[in-house]
Amino acid sequence: MDIIGIGYLGFETARMDEWRTYGPEVLGWQIGESPQADRDSLYFRMDDRRHRFAFHPGKTDRLAYIGWEARGKLEFQAAVQRLREAGIEVAQGDAALRGVRDVVRFRDPVGYQHELFYSQKWMPRSFIPGRPHGGFTAGARGLGHIVLITPEFPPELEHFLTVVMGFHYYGAGAGKGKTAFYRSKLNNSTSHDIAYGHGPDKMGIQHIGLFVNNLRDVGETYDIVKQRNLPMMMTLGQHTQDPHVSFYHFSPGGFAFEIITELEPWHHDGFELNPEKLSIWGHEQVGPILGPSVRAPEEVLDPQGLEILARWRQPA
C-alpha cells in the first residue's frame, strides 16, 4: 500500500479539561475547531492540517483509532481493494467528520481500530502553536509513531502489517521480550511508524513519538515537564539505532509522549541491526515502561475488538 504514515489519531478520554490545558501549554499544540457534528470533542493541530489528534468524551482513556494516510485517490482505492482481497472487513467511515476526501475503517488481527483515508483538509501557514514553539516535523512523514501493547502476537499480525499493509519490518530493537517495529512503504524519513510489544494480558498505548523542528523545542518541553512535576518515563538521551535526541514523559491519558529532534536525517541501515543496548547515552529510566494506559484488554478494546482478540487469546 502507498501509505505515507499516520495522518491522525483518535482517543476516548474522561480527562478533557486536562488535555485542553496540557496540549497547548506543554506540547505546544493548537486547539482546533471541532466539527459541527462533534462539538463535544477536542481537536488539536500540530501543523497546517485540520487536525492531528482528536479526543472524544468517554468513560475511560483509551485509543479509539489510528488514521493511516494514503498518497491519493488511486492509492486509496487500491489499498481498500487489497484489504478486501485479504478477507478483512472494511466499513465506510465519516469523511466529513474526519475532514478528508474518503475514509474506511478496519481492525488489525488483535482488535485495534484502524482507518485509511486520503486528502485531509489543510490551510497553508495557518498553524499557531499554543505556546512559543518552533513547530513539529510532520507533513510527508506523518505525525510520528505509536507503540502498542498486545497480549498475543500471532503470525497473522505480522502478515497483516507486512503483506497486507505493505509495511517494512525494521527490527526488534534492543528491548526485552517480543517487540517488532514497522514503517510505511512511503516513509523514508524515520525508522518506524508503528510497533507492537508483547505484554501478557495487557493492551494499550505504550508511547507516541512526536518530532519537533529543533533541539530547543525538545529542551523547552523538557523544562516545562519538570517545572510542572509531570511524571517522566525516561530522561534525555539518544537511541542506538537513530541519530535523534529525545525524552519520554506521561500524558493525561496515561501513555507517554516521546519528544524527538533529529541530529541528522535518518537513513535506512540497509540491514537489520541488533543493538547491544537501547541507547548510547541518557534515557535513564525514571518511571514505569508501561504506564496507566496499558491495562487489561477488557478496559481497552470495545466489544468488536475483544471478539477479534478472542481468536488468539490464551485462557488465563
Regions found by a protein language model. Give the residues of each.
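Conserved active-site tyrosine of GNAT-family acetyltransferases
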Residues: 19-24, 83, 111, 156-162, ...
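N-terminal beta-strand motif that seeds the catalytic metal site of vicinal oxygen chelate
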Residues: 1-17, 63-68, 121-155, 168, ...
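Vicinal oxygen chelate
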Residues: 5-14, 58-152, 180-185, 229-316, ...
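Conserved donor-binding loop and adjoining core beta-sheet/short helix segment
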Residues: 33-71, 92
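A compositional/structural signature marking long, glycine- and acidic/polar-rich segments
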Residues: 174, 179-243
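Short, charged/polar, Gly/Pro-enriched secondary-structure boundary elements
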Residues: 49-54, 111-115, 188-194, 254-256
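Core segments of cupin and vicinal oxygen chelate
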Residues: 1-51, 148-191
